[in-house]
């Protein structure tokens, strides 16, 4: 009797027994309704069910005296029996406790799905939900279970030196907050939670300090160094104050504001009245000569004559009566100016109310005045003295004589000579020497006279180093920032039309992690991936459902929504399989289900894999959920083990089987991972553009495109995000791409290279990257923000850290659209995660040992600027508000540098829009500017203070940190690595073969045919070592030694005739009529394959009927139904069964690809039977147009892979014309998008086996190019 699926050793949990092959027994039917799938399976292993649940029992003993009794599990596609304990063992949990009622909704709107009922009969119509575990008998209710107590353990871990120093700094900054307040008021019972709060507070204080330092340095530090810098005016600056409401003037080296004075009538002489119009003529000028001090008052003890007055060398008053002469020289009567002390007693006290600052001169103007205007002025002790009028007066009266003339030479002659010989210079040193030669009284008289009569103002102290150092530093930083802005502008200014790359043929995995997204969002994402302008056979949609969870607004769990969208029959239920997740304690043990199939959308038929993480039976809250990082690591770890042919978990083995045996593509073929979020839709040409960039530059290991908003007009919240999304790509990422170091490749739209193009070195699947990225102990604030909040950014950081010589790039040509948060609360939560993860990741990047560039021209400097810019965002907004206030109130000069930076920032951005003719972005920029306080103040401050806002696990608790970290482990279900069995796929297939060989005619393959391991490069099975159990009579024909590159060729490099002869000489390889018509021997032979069918029991595909040519030759995927994960494998070193595309993707040499011409119609979704009954596969059109070489099939005389219409010429001498004719004929029948030159040459070699055309490969290549160019 043929074996059934339940007899296979690859039962969903039989992988736990790695010691021996199972002993399969056949049960006799009790009646005519016997279900052939019901078979009892006995195991050498003591208790399979207990072994499966060993994660709940630490150090589970392997008892061998347990009786095995079959127990039938029902309620899913295919039943199976498992032994249970007849006599329970103390302390062993052999069954799962019934859960509390479930299906309840949480406070955040998330509803957890109900656990299924497994008591329904096998043929029940009850819809089977995504149950996390198989049925478990309620053994505890029967008193058969002794519950295990919690396991308490203490683990001491060493802390790094950096961590120890950070803890010290944290306590230094937060020591003033006692812990008992955090315990009682803050309700922080755990030490690690309190430590994270202290770290958060310390970081927040540092950020506030940084903002305060920036504002202090920009606004106040300069004033400390140069206190009166805003209280000094030179001649040009004073001239700017000539308005009606801005009336400044200088008198005797001091500046006064006469705005509230000049309009009043201040003259006490009726004959000389004033007016505001007349007063405005004096605004903004130095009025010292209009207020001469009597010389007897200005120079006491030196001038005794009240008649002495000085002549002006270069001064003409606007009106003569504006000169305020006081004392005896005043000609008017009844005026206050008649008082000789009017200047000191009346004028000076009145001017004090209008005083503003100093009237200053710089050295250059003093020097030029001495040269061009012949002024006799000089600098002494930073004060400017002008003796021009004094020297002019002496010269004027030098020819006069008389005893009544005053003594005009009242100053010391040495001082006068010094001013004449050193005019325009600083004479401080010489002046001190002259004064020291005088008596103290005489020197004092000389200085009093100079200060009262000849003082003009101060040397401009704003030009001194003390006052200029601040401005120069700000200018230097401004230049660097403006240069960075300009570089970003140039990076974004990529004019010209989009490039149109040719369609590439690289194999790509489209990874889509999903959590609680809705049906509309998921459908939009899946449809966009299916509609990509990329070869459908070379892209794989890989969806990972992170838990069996009902999202807010959904009526079904997210995995159910995904499977319904893909057309999976809800009656098909996969079995949960073990794998290791990222988590604490028992959370590391997880179960997942695998589904595969084809998804059809608008003419595209794309294979898919769906992995549903369903969790352990004991999980009630969010079963299976481990986070997005775990979903990414699941695929990365799987591809890593595929690459190195390493032992895999049961879930990974099932994925391998589905990809290799069901879909028909070896997972080692895939070269790229296309990461797309479940709320993101990609444009049709996006993937090909991203892959084209990596194909052009093999140094690129990661690349992203531009992400735009799909709902930009939905709400005000989305509107303020449009421009922010644009500049984050076209300025930030475009600039970083110049260095080849994009610091954040978003997980919603990025491509990573799986392995390098040269050498096959693993990249994103590198063990180093995975080990760091899969860190399970996330117990500090820094790790929480890296791994829990910003996993996508940290993955990019790890790639840059471990592959510093490679490039991370950005291309604006590839575009995707994502759904931005439309509610303020959602945006707040998103930006909190993004901002905090950005800070922690930038800190990590700062300390990477190898980053391109040097000093200010390095990526490290750019990262520092980004980090500083993120931290001081609130200070930036505060400074802008300050500028607006001081400029609008006129209390300070216009900050030209600051305004130039702002203008450069937004002006260059606007120029980009204009040049690219994206004028709408100018409007979005204005919206962004109006919302600038939100982006720079509210969101950052909220994010900084909420840096410790995340969940803490209860399994691992850190109770103390110092030189060592003490961790208390408190777990109901302790985890150890031995709970998960690991096998290589070769071993897994071998066990499957051994089990099937008990009921098969074919012996097991020899050891020589087993797949060998290749380390360090991607590896595919040798076609010659892959044999089908039902098509090969023995394993003796398997070659003992294989050449990878030779055997991966559709035809091989030699011995073609030998292999063809082997095929034709084997009766099982001939497409005889008895098989075609479904004769009894072949029908029995096909029926004997049922136990090894990849579709397994419960599948909608019936291999018996299809082999007989029955109606509707439909692959289950072609009808919209999906293949649930079935534990059915083909034996090792055997050829894959028919793939989802209707033909083997990798056939061994000499094996007919589609040689079996069925009697029935081969109708499929997207294909139909050809005129000769030949299979026409979906997505490929007429089979006659498809090259057998491009499909991996051989050139044989039988089967669909034969050279139709072409005969083999065995002559040694052939004409070139004949070769060209057959070359043209052969190419006309091929799919030119997939056929290669090598396949074409191999076909010609086969058509002319004795012509020696192998030596004319170059000539053949030229003819191929010529024919293609002419077609």
Swiss-Prot record:
One annotated GO biological process: chitin biosynthetic process
Membrane topology is: Multi-pass membrane protein
GO MF term (any one): chitin synthase activity
* Primary location recorded for the protein, binned into one broad class: membrane
* DNA-binding listed as a keyword: no
Q: What happens when the gene is disrupted?
A: Decreases cellular chitin level. Decreases capsular diameter. Increases extracellular vesicle secretion.
Q: Which residues are glycosylated?
A: 407, 713, 836, 1055, 1161
Cite the record's Polar residues compositional bias ranges. Answer: 21-30, 1027-1037
Keyword Coiled coil appears in the UniProt entry? no
InterPro entries to which the protein is assigned, alphabetical: Chitin_synth, Cyt_B5-like_heme/steroid-bd, Cyt_B5-like_heme/steroid_sf, DEK_C, Nucleotide-diphossugar_trans
Where does the source fall among the domains of life? Eukaryota
Which reactions does this protein catalyse?
[(1->4)-N-acetyl-beta-D-glucosaminyl](n) + UDP-N-acetyl-alpha-D-glucosamine = [(1->4)-N-acetyl-beta-D-glucosaminyl](n+1) + UDP + H(+)
List all membrane-crossing ranges: 165-185, 201-221, 473-493, 867-887, 894-914, 919-939
The record's keywords, sorted A to Z, are: Cell membrane, Cell wall biogenesis/degradation, Glycoprotein, Glycosyltransferase, Membrane, Transferase, Transmembrane, Transmembrane helix
**EC number(s) given by UniProt:** 2.4.1.16
Which Gene3D superfamilies does the record cross-reference, listed alphabetically? Cytochrome b5-like heme/steroid binding domain, Homeodomain-like
Triggers of expression: Induced by the antifungal agent caspofungin.
SUPFAM superfamilies referenced in this protein's UniProt entry, alphabetically: Cytochrome b5-like heme/steroid binding domain, DEK C-terminal domain, Nucleotide-diphospho-sugar transferases
Region of interest (Disordered), residue spans: 1-45, 58-117, 999-1081
Places the protein is found: Cell membrane
Q: Where is the DEK-C domain?
A: 1213-1269
Could you tell me which Pfam families the record lists for this protein? Chitin_synth_2, Cyt-b5, DEK_C
Biological role: Polymerizes chitin, a structural polymer of the cell wall and septum, by transferring the sugar moiety of UDP-GlcNAc to the non-reducing end of the growing chitin polymer. Produces a large proportion of the chitin that is not deacetylated to chitosan.
Q: Its family?
A: Belongs to the chitin synthase family.
Q: What is the protein named?
A: Chitin synthase 4
**What species was this sequence derived from?**
Cryptococcus neoformans var. grubii serotype A (strain H99 / ATCC 208821 / CBS 10515 / FGSC 9487) (Filobasidiella neoformans var. grubii)
């Amino acid at each position: 009797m043929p074996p059934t699926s339940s007899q296979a050793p690859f039962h969903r949990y039989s992988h736990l027994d790695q010691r021996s092959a199972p002993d399969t027994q056949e049960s006799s039917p009790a009646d005519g309704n016997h279900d052939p799938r019901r078979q009892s399976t006995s195991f050498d292993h003591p208790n399979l069910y207990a072994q499966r649940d060993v994660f709940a029992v630490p150090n589970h003993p392997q008892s061998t005296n347990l009786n095995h009794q079959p127990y039938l599990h029902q309620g899913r596609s295919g039943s199976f029996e498992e032994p249970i304990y007849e006599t329970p063992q103390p302390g062993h949990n052999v069954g799962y406790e019934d859960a509390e009622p479930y299906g309840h909704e949480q406070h955040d709107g998330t509803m957890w799905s109900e656990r299924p009922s497994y008591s329904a009969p096998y043929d029940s119509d009850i819809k089977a939900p995504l149950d996390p575990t198989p049925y478990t008998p309620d053994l505890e209710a029967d008193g058969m279970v002794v519950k295990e107590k919690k396991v308490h353990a203490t683990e001491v871990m060493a802390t790094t030196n950096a961590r120890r120093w950070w803890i010290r700094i944290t306590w230094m900054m937060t020591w003033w907050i006692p812990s008992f307040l955090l315990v009682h008021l803050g309700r922080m019972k755990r030490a690690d939670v309190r430590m994270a709060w202290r770290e958060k507070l310390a970081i927040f204080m540092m950020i506030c300090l940084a903002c305060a330092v920036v504002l202090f340095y920009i606004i106040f530090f300069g004033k400390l160094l140069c206190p009166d810098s805003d209280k000094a005016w030179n001649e040009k600056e004073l001239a700017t104050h000539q308005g009606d409401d801005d009336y400044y003037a200088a008198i005797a080296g001091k500046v006064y504001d006469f705005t509230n004075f000049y309009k009043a009538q201040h003259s006490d002489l009726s004959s000389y009245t004033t007016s505001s119009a007349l007063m405005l003529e004096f605004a903004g000028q130095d009025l010292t000569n209009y207020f001469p001090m009597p010389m007897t008052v200005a120079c006491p003890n030196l001038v005794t004559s009240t008649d002495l007055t000085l002549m002006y060398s270069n001064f003409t008053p606007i009106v003569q009566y504006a000169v305020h002469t006081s004392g005896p020289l005043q000609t008017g009567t009844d005026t206050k100016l008649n008082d000789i002390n009017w200047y000191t007693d009346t004028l000076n006290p009145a001017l004090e109310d209008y005083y503003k600052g100093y009237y200053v001169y710089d050295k250059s103007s003093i020097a030029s005045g001495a040269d061009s205007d012949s002024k006799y002025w000089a600098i002494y002790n930073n004060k400017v003295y002008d003796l021009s009028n004094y020297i002019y007066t002496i010269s004027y009266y030098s020819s006069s004589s008389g005893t009544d003339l005053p003594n005009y030479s009242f100053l010391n002659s040495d001082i006068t000579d010094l001013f004449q010989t050193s005019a325009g210079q600083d004479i401080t040193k010489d002046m001190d020497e002259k004064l020291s030669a005088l008596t103290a009284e005489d020197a004092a008289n000389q200085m009093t006279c100079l200060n009262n009569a000849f003082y003009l103002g101060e040397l401009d102290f704003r030009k001194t180093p003390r006052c200029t150092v601040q401005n120069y530093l700000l200018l230097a930083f401004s230049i660097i920032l403006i240069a960075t802005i300009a570089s970003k502008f140039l990076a974004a200014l990529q004019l010209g039309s989009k490039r149109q790359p040719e369609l590439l043929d690289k194999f790509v995995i489209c990874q889509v992690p999903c959590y609680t997204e809705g049906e509309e969002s998921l459908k939009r994402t899946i449809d966009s991936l299916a509609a990509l302008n990329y070869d459908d056979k070379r892209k794989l949609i890989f969806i990972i459902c992170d838990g069996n969870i009902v999202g807010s607004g959904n009526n079904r769990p997210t995995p159910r929504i995904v499977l319904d969208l893909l057309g999976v029959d809800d009656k098909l239920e996969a079995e949960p399989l073990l794998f290791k997740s990222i988590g604490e304690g028992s959370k590391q043990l997880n179960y997942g289900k695998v589904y595969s199939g084809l998804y059809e959308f608008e003419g595209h038929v794309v294979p898919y894999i769906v992995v549903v993480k369903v969790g352990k039976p004991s999980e009630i809250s969010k079963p299976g959920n481990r986070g997005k990082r775990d979903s990414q690591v699941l695929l990365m770890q799987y591809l890593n083990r595929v690459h190195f042919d390493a032992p895999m978990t049961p879930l990974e083995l099932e994925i391998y089987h589905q990809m290799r045996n069901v879909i028909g593509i070896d997972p080692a073929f895939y070269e790229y991972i296309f990461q797309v979020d479940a709320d993101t839709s990609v444009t049709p040409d996006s993937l090909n553009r991203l892959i084209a960039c990596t194909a052009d530059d093999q140094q690129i290991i990661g690349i992203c495109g531009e992400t735009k908003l799909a709902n930009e007009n939905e709400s005000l919240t989305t509107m303020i995000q449009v421009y922010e999304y644009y500049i984050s790509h076209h300025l930030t990422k475009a600039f970083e791409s110049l260095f080849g170091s994009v610091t954040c490749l978003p997980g919603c739209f990025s491509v990573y290279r799986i392995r390098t193009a040269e050498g096959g070195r693993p990249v994103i699947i590198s063990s180093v990257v995975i080990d760091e990225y899969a860190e399970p102990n996330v117990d500090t604030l820094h790790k929480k923000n890296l791994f829990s909040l910003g996993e996508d950014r940290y993955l990019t950081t790890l790639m840059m850290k471990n592959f510093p010589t490679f490039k991370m790039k950005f291309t604006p040509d590839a575009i995707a659209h994502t759904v931005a948060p439309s509610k303020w609360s959602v945006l707040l939560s998103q930006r909190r995660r993004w901002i905090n993860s950005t800070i922690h990741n930038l800190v990590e990047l700062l300390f990477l040992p190898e980053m391109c560039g040097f000093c200010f021209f390095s990526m490290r400097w750019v990262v520092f600027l980004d980090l500083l810019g993120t931290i001081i965002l609130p200070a930036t907004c505060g400074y802008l508000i300050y500028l607006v206030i001081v400029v609008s109130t006129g209390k300070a000069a216009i900050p030209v540098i600051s305004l130039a930076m702002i203008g450069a920032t937004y002006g260059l951005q606007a120029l980009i829009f204009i040049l690219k003719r994206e004028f709408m972005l100018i409007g979005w920029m204005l919206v962004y500017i109006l919302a600038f306080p939100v982006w720079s103040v509210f969101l950052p401050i909220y994010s900084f203070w909420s840096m410790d806002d995340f969940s803490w696990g209860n399994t691992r608790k850190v109770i103390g940190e110092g030189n060592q970290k003490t961790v208390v482990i408190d777990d109901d279900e302790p985890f150890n690595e031995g709970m998960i069995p690991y096998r290589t796929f070769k071993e897994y297939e071998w066990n499957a073969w051994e089990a099937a060989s008990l009921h098969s005619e074919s012996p097991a393959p020899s050891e020589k045919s087993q797949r060998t391991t290749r380390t360090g490069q991607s590896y595919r099975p040798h076609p010659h070592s892959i044999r089908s159990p039902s098509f090969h009579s023995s394993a003796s024909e398997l070659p003992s030694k294989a050449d990878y590159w030779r055997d991966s060729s559709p035809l091989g490099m030699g011995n073609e005739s030998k292999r063809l002869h082997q095929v034709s000489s084997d009766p099982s390889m001939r497409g005889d009529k008895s098989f075609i018509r479904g004769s009894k021997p072949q029908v029995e032979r096909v029926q004997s394959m049922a136990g090894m069918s990849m579709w397994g029991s419960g599948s909608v595909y019936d291999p018996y009927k299809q082999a007989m040519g029955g109606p509707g030759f439909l692959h289950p995927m072609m009808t919209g139904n999906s293949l649930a994960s079935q534990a059915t494998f083909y034996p090792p070193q055997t050829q894959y069964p028919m793939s989802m595309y209707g033909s083997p993707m990798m056939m061994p040499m000499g094996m007919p690809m589609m040689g079996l011409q069925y009697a029935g119609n081969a109708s499929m979704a997207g294909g139909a039977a050809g005129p000769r009954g030949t299979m026409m596969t979906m997505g490929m059109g007429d089979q006659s147009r498809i090259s057998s070489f491009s499909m991996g099939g051989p050139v044989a005389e039988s089967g669909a892979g034969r050279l139709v219409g072409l005969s083999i010429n065995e002559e040694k001498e052939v004409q070139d014309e004949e070769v060209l004719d057959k070359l043209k004929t052969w190419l006309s029948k091929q799919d030119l998008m997939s056929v290669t030159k090598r396949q074409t040459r191999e076909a010609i070699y086969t058509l002319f086996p004795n012509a020696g055309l192998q030596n004319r490969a170059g000539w053949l290549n030229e003819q191929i190019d010529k024919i293609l160019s002419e077609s």
